[in-house]
Structures are given as C-alpha cells and as structure tokens.
Amino acid sequence: MRILVNGAGVAGLTVAWQLYRHGFRVTLAERAGTVGAGASGFAGGMLAPWCERESAEEPVLTLGRLAADWWEAALPGHVHRRGTLVVAGGRDTGELDRFSRRTSGWEWLDEVAIAALEPDLAGRFRRALFFRQEAHLDPRQALAALAAGLEDARMRLTLGVVGESDVDHDRVVDCTGAAQIGRLPGLRGVRGEMLCVETTEVSLSRPVRLLHPRHPIYIVPRDKNRFMVGATMIESDDGGPITARSLMELLNAAYAMHPAFGEARVTETGAGVRPAYPDNLPRVTQEGRTLHVNGLYRHGFLLAPAMAGEVARRLLTEQGQPERRAS
C-alpha cells in the first residue's frame, strides 16, 4: 500500500517511521524547507507521563509511558533516562503536596538527596518530588535523526513543496497540526512560548519543574551548556513572536530556580501553536481516503508514538494483515 504522509513534525515523522517499519511504501511531504518547522521545533522533549498526569487525563499516562522505549528503539542513544525533578520555592511548597496528590510514580527527596542528584541546586530547595522513570530528549536532534534515518532507508522525503499529489497514493495521512484549525471540528490552538539560554554557571542533568500557582515552568538541559525554558500556555492560535510579558515570566522563574540564570545569554526565543481538541487528547480520525492525526496539544513527543501505532493498526487491518512488532 502506498501512503502519503503530509507534515514533517513529530506526528508525521513518527507515523512515517512506523509505517515504513511495517513495510508500507511511504512518501513524506512537508511545506517548510525543514523538518520540525512548526510547534514540534519548540517542544521541551520531556517524556514525562507521570508528571503530565497532574493536569491531563488518564490516557496521557497509559499511552505515554511507552514513549521512551519507542524513541530509544527508533533512535538509540537519543533518550536520556534520568528522571524529572519537581521543586517549589519556599512560599509555594504547598504546590508540591498538591502535585503529589494528583500524580503517581514519585518519591520524596530531602535537601541531601536533591544535592546528590543536582549539586547546583544544593541548599536551594528543602524538598522535591523525583519521578525516576521519566526521560527526555532533544526534539530538534531527534526529528533530524528520524528524517535522516528515513532518507537512508530510501523513503521519499520532499521538503519545501506545496503538497504532493495524492492521486498516486492509496491513502493519505494528514499530520499538519495547527494548519487544520478551523477545518477539523473542535480543533483549537494553544499558544506556547519558550526561550533558550546558555551559561556555564549552572549544570543540570535532567528536566527540573518549578511549581508556582500562576507561572509554573520547566527547564530542560541541552548540550553545550544550553537550557530550554518553557513554556507558557495561552488559549490563542497566534503564532507571532514571544511577548514581553511571557519573556519576563520565564526569565524571572528561571532566576528563581537559580540566580546564575540571570547572567545567562538568551540565545533564542520562540512561539508555536499547539493543536488541541476540547479534552486535550489526540485523535486519529478518518475523512474519505485520509486519516487525520491531530490534537497532540503539549504532548507531541510523548503521545506521537501511540498515534503512529494506531495509524499502523488501522492500515494493517484494512490490508488484512496482522500487526507485527515495529520500532
């Protein structure tokens, strides 16, 4: 079966990879000149289903807990399994108790244990929650590696094109995300803003979430002394540059985590529109010969593998073939 996948963000790339591994003939098309040009490129890359359960429905945990294994199988060496640390400032320590009641899979840490995990946070927080089973990856590196793997496998990847003709394909899988807002019923945009900083004065080994009643943030370590700080959530489909207010909120929160971030160089700011359905859960829907994969909201890297698996199951069932294990 010949499949056209439109959109080379995290949804399109994972779908293309999964279908290729199942033996489908896949063409991947992307309007932009690069992969991950939309919201996927501004993601944190946290594979954190237990933490996300704090404000998400149960499927985020049940589907998302398989994501780290999927990414490790597809891209060996790209997944960092170091857990997630969740902290709160002195006046906000009650947020930790609230967070613990709404999640599972954590263990309490005292000051000594925090310092053992993250020496640069020694003495800054009295207690923390540690989600040992969680992981993270660098989104842009992962997307580029997935695209390179598909090209090495001689799968057709076309970038910077308006759109491939679907006439020569048996099925189309649309993974164009926010481009479908206003077209797919119930799909809306949620704006997310982030920034990247660079400093040699702070070292972190894992994502750290700083809880706050109004402005919770996370900081994800990257390579070369870089950190991604995110992310706002605004009910809007405005994809324009980051606002001054959001920039100040993110920088102030990073400074509250460690004052050395006040001297960090801001190397990038960005904003993306995350497509979401009313329940904030992704869906695979069908419209004629087209399957739509959309609504990944803030869970792109966490839930895209599960959505790719669902697409593969549907197409294999249509062909009358049993699903075989694919990475």
From Swiss-Prot:
Keyword terms of this UniProt record = Oxidoreductase, Plasmid, Thiamine biosynthesis
What Pfam family is a match, any one?
DAO
Pathway noted in the entry: Cofactor biosynthesis; thiamine diphosphate biosynthesis
Q: Which GO terms describe its biological process?
A: thiamine biosynthetic process; thiamine diphosphate biosynthetic process
Q: InterPro entries recorded for this chain?
A: FAD-dep_OxRdtase (IPR006076), FAD/NAD-bd_sf (IPR036188), Gly_oxidase_ThiO (IPR012727)
Q: Which GO terms describe its cellular component?
A: cytoplasm
Q: Which GO terms describe its molecular function?
A: flavin adenine dinucleotide binding; oxidoreductase activity
Protein's job = May have amino acid oxidase activity in the biosynthesis of thiazole when cysteine gives its thiol group to be inserted into the thiazole molecule and the rest of the molecule is deaminated to give pyruvic acid and ammonia.
User: What name has this protein been given in UniProt?
Assistant: Putative thiamine biosynthesis oxidoreductase ThiO
Species of origin reads Rhizobium etli (strain ATCC 51251 / DSM 11541 / JCM 21823 / NBRC 15573 / CFN 42)
Q: Tell me the name of the encoding gene.
A: thiO
